[in-house]
Amino acid sequence: MKYYLIVGEASGDLHASHLMTALKAEDPQADFRFFGGDLMAAVGGTMVKHYKELAYMGFIPVLLHLRTIFANMKRCKEDIVAWNPDVVILVDYPGFNLNIAKFVHFETQIPVFYYISPKIWAWKEYRIKNIKRDVDELFSILPFEVEFYTLKHRYPIHYVGNPTVDEVTAYQKAHPKNPEAFLADNNLEDKPIIALLAGSRKQEIKDNLPDMLKAASAFPDYQLVLAGAPGIAPEYYKQYVGQAKVKIIFDQTYRLLQHAEAALVTSGTATLETALFRVPQVVCYYTPIGKVVSFLRRHILKVKFISLVNLIADREVVKELVADTMSVGNMQNELKKLIEDQEYKNRMLAEYEYMAARLGPAGAPQHAARKMLELLKK
């Protein structure tokens, strides 16, 4: 079969590459064409556009590149029609992909599958109308989305498991824990580690890292190790490190989590990865408009939590210090509990097991691929 995939960022490239590998295992004749990235290209097929030509985040960058964005959409639509695939598979990236879904629905007879659904349960719930109209089958990686889509909106979806479980499980099997080698390879001291995961975007790092360092520096018996984000130069971090004693390491986030005793983590997939490595954590997310965000969370946003760990468990597993509740003092208090209060730490680790059970076992790409082929062959 012919599969046309569209992703718009690095995480989509990763997840789509695993899905493509699983599709090839189920369908040896699989032919891929895609808007994607290097990982997808390594699996095989034809890359029409690299996601780096699509990825504009924030109001001003989008406004400045509107002509390019519309040109990319036009190119994508024309290419889909010309190639005439058996299915179009959209991966996350809803601003672009929902526009493509609408076009494919109205202008072709090609089925539209959505892998990693838009997070409309948190924001822009009105998009459900277009999803129900334009998307033939939706494949979710978050268990709580089943109730949201199926019960609340009468739109049946397929939960296939979470690919982060696959990624962490595969890493742990391939890389057994080796503290001595990790410390030696990174010129670290023989002291327990507090891991700092300060986000993947420059604004997140600017807003969060300085206070995270101040809070963690209050524990001199621990060494601080910062996970450098892909695409962020070491020089960018150094302007916010100041006099803090911290080691920055790149391309080793999983290895760092494997050897950490505690962690300060901004929101996003990193909170889930930290939990799957069974590292006690505090979720920290500061924004300069903290009071506005707090108001939005209470009155407009649809969710009780911001971390995937708490959202999946549907209860507070880890403490979230967000917007105007994030302060150096609050972070220090929570870190102290993680380090000194064994009962508190054990309770969090037990809750991690509950959360992991809700996610289910590894195998998300394989489950998705098998279900997709089953539906396409009907």
Task: Locate each region found by the language model.
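Nucleotide-activated sugar donor-binding and catalytic core shared by glycosyltransferases
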Residues: 1-378
